[in-house]
Amino acid sequence: MKFVYKEEHPFEKRRSEGEKIRKKYPDRVPVIVEKAPKARIGDLDKKKYLVPSDLTVGQFYFLIRKRIHLRAEDALFFFVNNVIPPTSATMGQLYQEHHEEDFFLYIAYSDESVYGL
């Protein structure tokens, strides 16, 4: 997926910012969250999050659900590198495995469980 954040901010600027964040907040993870291209779901009020490393993916789902005002029966799926991450994993584990060279973790969200639909 193409992340708008990457297109709006040059790599060096992102990397510099990501590096500063990691040094200043070593127990937190910088995350960029954007809606998948064809998702029929609400927009987030912001894209950039700084979350505790020990927060689980499941807890992060809850946080994002609240921010886009989803009802309990509405589906929400995350994609990290086109794969749905396990809800039991911590954001720190996800970050260690999937962060990019700019020190950010990128997560796409959708109402569909198949990426790109």
From Swiss-Prot:
**Record's keyword terms, sorted:** Apoptosis, Autophagy, Cytoplasm, Cytoplasmic vesicle, Cytoskeleton, Golgi apparatus, Lipoprotein, Membrane, Microtubule, Protein transport, Transport
- Where this protein primarily resides, as one coarse class? membrane
Read off the InterPro entries from this record: Atg8-like, Ubiquitin-like_domsf
The yes or no answer to whether the keyword Lipoprotein is present is: yes
PTM note says:
The precursor molecule is cleaved by ATG4 (ATG4A, ATG4B, ATG4C or ATG4D) to expose the glycine at the C-terminus and form the cytosolic form, GABARAP-I. The processed form is then activated by APG7L/ATG7, transferred to ATG3 and conjugated to phosphatidylethanolamine (PE) phospholipid to form the membrane-bound form, GABARAP-II. During non-canonical autophagy, the processed form is conjugated to phosphatidylserine (PS) phospholipid. ATG4 proteins also mediate the delipidation of PE-conjugated forms.
Q: Where is the lipid attached (Phosphatidylethanolamine amidated glycine)?
A: G116
Q: Does the keyword Membrane apply?
A: yes
Check the record and name the Gene3D superfamilies matching this protein: Phosphatidylinositol 3-kinase Catalytic Subunit, Chain A, domain 1
Ranges for region Interaction with GPHN: 36-117
* Annotated phenotype, changing R67A: No effect on interaction with TECPR2
* GO molecular function terms noted in the UniProt entry: beta-tubulin binding; GABA receptor binding; microtubule binding; phosphatidylethanolamine binding; ubiquitin protein ligase binding
Gene Ontology biological process terms in this record: autophagosome assembly; autophagosome maturation; cellular response to nitrogen starvation; chemical synaptic transmission; extrinsic apoptotic signaling pathway via death domain receptors; microtubule cytoskeleton organization; mitophagy; positive regulation of proteasomal ubiquitin-dependent protein catabolic process
Task: Kindly give the Pfam families that the UniProt entry links to this protein.
Answer: ATG8
Q: Which SUPFAM superfamilies match?
A: Ubiquitin-like
Q: How does it assemble?
A: Interacts with GPHN and NSF. Interacts with ATG7, ATG13. Interacts with ATG3. Interacts with alpha- and beta-tubulin. Interacts with GABRG2. Interacts with RB1CC1. Interacts with ULK1. Interacts with CALR. Interacts with DDX47. Interacts with TP53INP1 and TP53INP2. Interacts with TBC1D5 and TBC1D25. Directly interacts with SQSTM1. Interacts with MAPK15. Interacts with TECPR2. Interacts with PCM1. Interacts with TRIM5 and TRIM21. Interacts with MEFV. Interacts with KIF21B. Interacts with WDFY3; this interaction is required for WDFY3 recruitment to MAP1LC3B-positive p62/SQSTM1 bodies.
Name this protein carries in UniProt = Gamma-aminobutyric acid receptor-associated protein
Q: Report the source organism.
A: Homo sapiens
Please name the taxonomic classification of the source. Eukaryota, Metazoa, Chordata, Craniata, Vertebrata
